[in-house]
């Protein structure tokens, strides 16, 4: 084609590209508010789902195999006569030991727990239900306190309690303490071991301390301006718990670990061991021995494998013997193991126990050492004993149930009572300080007359001196004096009381320890006087070394039996004080001047109504001796002696005798009865 090249066949001419029009702002759709709100929610949901997947893939301890929800009653809080802070119960959260205070009994919770290797609490609620009113019982305040280390001994005070998780309880009102699983988590990914013998520190777990502060008073017993102590129940404590268990491993012996409270005042002696000087606890309390005696006989040397925890009221009396370890008794918590061999093996009524401050020390046998000399007897009003370590988890040596024939009844085993030496006697329930005994009951006096009690013995003595200070008692008849020295006599261990005057026929009525037990157990105190009674004020120098008598203490004015003068000032008289807190019987004597010489014979004192003249007749020191024919009358001289007819011959004889023989015996007895009747009519 002329004038230019021809275009390729089939080619399309280029056309300009048309630009797409963007939608205008009016045409663009705005997202709704609902869509905007859903976007962050979906993002958060995806984030949570991712976290859940990560947590599922992570291993947090063993898997939960079983759970149990139940309610357990763990005990009661009772009123107290002491004025300090006292621990009455320490309850472990270990399900084997969370039980009512009834010794080695099983509970549904302990049975379930003994079947597994590990436990952890999912939820815990502690309820205190009041058992007394708030209008008539006053003076005390209760505490529920959480202790993360249940096997730790510490000297607690109200300030240290309030620094921990606690609930303060006013009398007569219900309270609740709720705990979460996080607060009670164990050391093994939140789990605790069940068997306390494997690793007690990893098994015992946290504990709740049930405490009471200050003395409890009963306003209904108010008389003459003074109130009486209340020692009844204040609260019942129960725990509503949910437990998780893991790793099935049944151990039947763990079902019956002991957890029991003992009341009534248990006396123990703290002293250095004669073998190595370590501190040991000695007791002859039958209740304590029954709990702490090993179940399996055979061990003769060393120390028992079973470890016991003792939680009780705070005791200050033994601090001098314990030395730097005095906080154990002040805190009211320590651990013991029975000592075999030596004097403990020779004496079946008294046992010795090694004292430890912690379970780790008990497991490795690391005892404590206090002062090298000295012995101190202390009385724990309330103590709670727990079996911490039982070496045999398969058996607790309890008698197995039987399905065969009923066993033959066994006669009761005789119980050996401690009668000698007298210093070992600790008290007998129901016996007042002064009494007449008719063979079956004890009758206290109804007045406060003097010349009714004699006190003798070989007391421990010391003379203390100091700056001029007030000493004595002031009431309507007696007045205080200024003193620079005091003679102090301790009759606790070796004092003996005799009745005199109208009580002369009673003979020996008390030892020092049994008298203290009688006064502190709520018996009629006559002729003893309350130290805080209305109109009476006590003065005791600070250098005397003993507290000023007060609430719960009792006293008597006493004089030498050779002194029949009337004293109205606190000079040349004995003030015999029975201290409730320390359980000691102390006599204070003020000579008013020079030191008193050592006695050349045993002291012998008689009681005088404080500030009054001695009661007449004065004490006598012998009674009338009866002749033999007055003591034992010959049976032949008594016409009615045949009244005592024994039927033993008619019921105990040869089982092969005939019936005729029994009939003849019966006729013979009837004939003797008729003869006796005729003889009475003739008389």
Curated annotation (Swiss-Prot):
Residues 398-413 have a biased composition (Pro residues). Residues 1-13 have a biased composition (Low complexity). One of its GO terms (cellular component) is T=1 icosahedral viral capsid. Keywords: Capsid protein, Host-virus interaction, Inhibition of host complement factors by virus, T=1 icosahedral capsid protein, Viral immunoevasion, Virion. Self-assembles to form an icosahedral T=3 immature capsid. Belongs to the astroviridae capsid polyprotein family. This is Capsid polyprotein VP90.
């Amino acid at each position: 084609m002329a004038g230019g090249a021809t275009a390729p066949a089939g080619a399309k001419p280029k056309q300009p590209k048309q630009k797409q029009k963007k939608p205008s702002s009016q045409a663009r759709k705005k997202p709704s508010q609902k869509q905007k709100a859903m976007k962050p929610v979906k993002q958060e949901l995806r984030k949570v789902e991712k976290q859940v997947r990560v947590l599922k893939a992570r291993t947090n301890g063993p898997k939960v195999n079983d759970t149990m929800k139940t309610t357990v009653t763990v005990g009661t809080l009772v009123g107290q006569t002491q004025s300090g802070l006292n621990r009455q119960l320490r309850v472990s959260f270990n399900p084997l030991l969370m039980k009512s205070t009834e010794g080695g009994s099983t509970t549904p919770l302990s049975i379930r727990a003994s079947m597994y290797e590990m436990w952890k609490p999912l939820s815990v609620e502690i309820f205190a239900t009041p058992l007394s009113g708030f209008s008539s019982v006053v003076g005390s305040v209760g505490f529920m306190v959480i202790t993360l280390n249940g096997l730790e001994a510490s000297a607690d005070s109200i300030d240290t309690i309030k620094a921990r998780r606690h609930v303060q309880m006013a009398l007569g009102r219900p309270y609740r303490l709720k705990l979460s699983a996080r607060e009670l988590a164990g050391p093994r990914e939140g789990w605790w071991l069940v068997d306390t013998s494997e690793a007690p520190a990893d098994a015992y777990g946290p504990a709740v301390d049930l405490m009471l502060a200050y003395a409890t008073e009963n306003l209904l017993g108010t008389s003459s301006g003074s109130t009486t102590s209340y020692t009844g129940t204040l609260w019942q404590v129960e725990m509503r718990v949910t437990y998780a268990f893991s790793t099935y491993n049944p151990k039947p012996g763990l079902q019956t670990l002991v957890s029991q409270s003992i009341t009534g005042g248990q006396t123990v002696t703290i002293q250095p061991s004669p073998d190595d000087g370590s501190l040991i606890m000695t007791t002859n309390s039958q209740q304590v021995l029954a709990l702490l005696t090993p179940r399996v006989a055979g061990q003769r040397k060393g120390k028992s494998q079973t470890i016991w925890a003792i939680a009780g009221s705070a005791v200050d009396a033994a601090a001098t013997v314990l030395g730097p370890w005095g906080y154990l008794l002040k805190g009211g918590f320590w651990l013991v193991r029975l000592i075999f061999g030596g004097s403990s093996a020779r004496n079946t009524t008294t046992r010795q126990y090694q004292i430890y401050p912690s379970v780790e020390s008990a497991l490795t046998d690391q005892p404590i050492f206090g002062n090298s000399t000295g012995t101190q007897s202390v009385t724990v009003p309330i103590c709670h004993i727990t079996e911490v370590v039982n070496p045999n988890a398969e058996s607790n040596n309890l008698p197995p149930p039987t399905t065969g024939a009923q066993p033959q009844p066994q006669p009761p085993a005789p119980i050996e009572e401690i009668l000698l030496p007298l210093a070992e006697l600790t008290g007998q329930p129901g016996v007042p300080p002064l009494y007449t005994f008719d063979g079956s009951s004890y009758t206290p006096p109804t007045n406060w007359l003097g010349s009714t009690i004699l006190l003798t013995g070989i007391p421990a003595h010391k003379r203390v001196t100091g700056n001029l200070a007030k000493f004595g008692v002031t009431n309507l008849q007696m007045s205080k004096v200024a003193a620079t020295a005091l003679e102090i006599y301790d009759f606790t261990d070796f004092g003996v009381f005799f009745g005199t005057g109208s009580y002369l026929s009673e003979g020996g009525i008390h030892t020092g320890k049994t008298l203290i037990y009688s006064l502190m157990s709520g018996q009629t105190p006559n002729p003893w006087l309350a130290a805080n009674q209305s109109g009476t004020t006590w003065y005791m120098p600070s250098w005397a070394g003993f507290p000023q008598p007060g609430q719960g203490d009792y006293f008597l004015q006493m004089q030498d039996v050779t002194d029949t003068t009337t004293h109205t000032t606190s000079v040349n008289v004995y003030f015999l004080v029975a201290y409730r807190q320390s359980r000691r019987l102390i006599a204070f004597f003020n000579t008013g001047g020079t030191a008193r010489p050592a006695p050349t014979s045993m002291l012998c004192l008689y009681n005088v109504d404080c500030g009054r003249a001695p009661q007449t007749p004065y004490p006598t020191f012998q009674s009338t001796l009866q002749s033999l024919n007055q003591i034992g009358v010959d049976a032949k001289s008594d016409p009615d002696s045949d009244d005592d007819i024994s039927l033993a011959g008619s019921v105990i004889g040869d089982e092969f005798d005939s019936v005729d023989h029994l009939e003849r015996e019966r006729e013979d007895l009837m004939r003797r009865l008729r003869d006796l009747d005729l003889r009475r009519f003739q008389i």
